[in-house]
């Protein structure tokens, strides 16, 4: 909204040889998207979620507010979910928001471990793309599938 481009990433400190707090960082990009501007800023930590890991960060403007959307938990089982934080700016601070899309029944079908969210505004509606387990989980022979819904549908599912 401010005409600037931002890069988001998570620290990989959940790796066995590192062991530290997993955080999400943001840093401004140059107008051509090639160079970094300024210093990175930690905007959110996994400790706020009660999960050991957070990943797949995305900043989304929706309803005139800025949200950080992320996946939390372990992707291979039903504890994986999509969480949100409300942010003051792309540089933080971001605070956990009371909206989570967790495993459950959605539009008459089971959704297990929803994560990997991408948000797309096509000018007419806001679409949310995520993946979910079908027929079990990683340990029980399940497969991942993509799901595309409107933001309004996802909000109804999560509440």
Where are these regions (language model features)?
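Carbohydrate-active catalytic/glycan-binding domains of CAZyme proteins
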Residues: 1-159
């Amino acid at each position: 909204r401010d005409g600037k481009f931002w890069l988001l990433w998570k620290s990989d400190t959940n790796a066995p040889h590192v062991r530290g707090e997993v955080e999400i960082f943001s840093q401004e990009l140059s107008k051509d998207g090639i160079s970094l501007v300024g210093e990175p800023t930690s905007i959110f930590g996994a400790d706020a979620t009660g999960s050991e890991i957070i990943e797949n960060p995305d900043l989304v403007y929706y309803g005139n507010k800025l949200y950080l959307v992320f996946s939390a938990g372990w992707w291979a089982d039903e504890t994986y979910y999509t969480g949100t934080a409300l942010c003051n700016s792309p540089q933080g601070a971001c605070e956990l928001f009371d909206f989570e899309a967790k495993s459950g029944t959605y539009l008459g079908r089971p959704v297990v471990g929803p994560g990997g969210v991408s948000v797309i505004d096509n000018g007419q509606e806001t679409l949310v793309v995520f993946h979910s387990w079908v027929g079990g989980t990683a340990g029980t022979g399940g497969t991942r599938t993509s799901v595309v819904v409107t933001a309004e549908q996802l909000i109804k599912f999560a509440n």
